[in-house]
Amino acid sequence: MEPGRFRNRVKILTFTTSRDPSGQPVESWTGGNPVPAEVKGISGREQLSGGAETAQATIRVWMRFRSELNASSRLEVLSGPYKGQVLNIIGPPVANATGTRLEILCKTGAEK
């Protein structure tokens, strides 16, 4: 591992459904502790959709292997240039050859 590579912090968000006092289901995204990661932008695009301009960015996140992370999770960026953004994972996390790190491709911006 290169020192200083994982200088950003992200929180892994998982979708949960619970019940409120009246018994109705309440859906929410809950997160655990912050984990170190490397967050880098890959590409971005703008398009017109329904008369409104929308923008999307593709972001690559590297982190140490985490078994609780899957394609249905989200990542909340807590530090760095993307601080405060919630990233939608667009594919399954891919482990490196030694199984110690994960590469995660994410999108931010308007979702269809």
UniProtKB/Swiss-Prot annotation:
Mainly resides where?
virion
User: Which keywords does UniProt give here?
Assistant: Viral genome ejection through host cell envelope, Viral long flexible tail ejection system, Viral penetration into host cytoplasm, Virion, Virus entry into host cell
Superkingdom, according to UniProt? Viruses
Question: What does the UniProt entry say about where the protein is found?
Answer: Virion
Query: InterPro entries of this UniProt entry?
Result: Phage_SPP1_head-tail_adaptor, SSP1_head-tail_sf
- UniProt cross-references to Pfam families, sorted A to Z: Phage_H_T_join
Q: Which residues form the signal peptide?
A: none
Q: What does this protein do?
A: Functions as a stopper that is part of the head-tail connector and that locks the viral DNA in the capsid. Following tail attachment to the entry receptor, seems to open by a diaphragm-like motion, allowing the genome to exit the capsid through the tail tube to the host cell. During assembly, functions as a docking platform which the preassembled tail tapered by the head-tail joining protein gp17 can bind to.
What does the subunit section of this Swiss-Prot or TrEMBL entry state?
Interacts with the connector protein gp15. Interacts with the head-tail joining protein gp17.
Instruction: Return the protein name.
Output: Head completion protein gp7
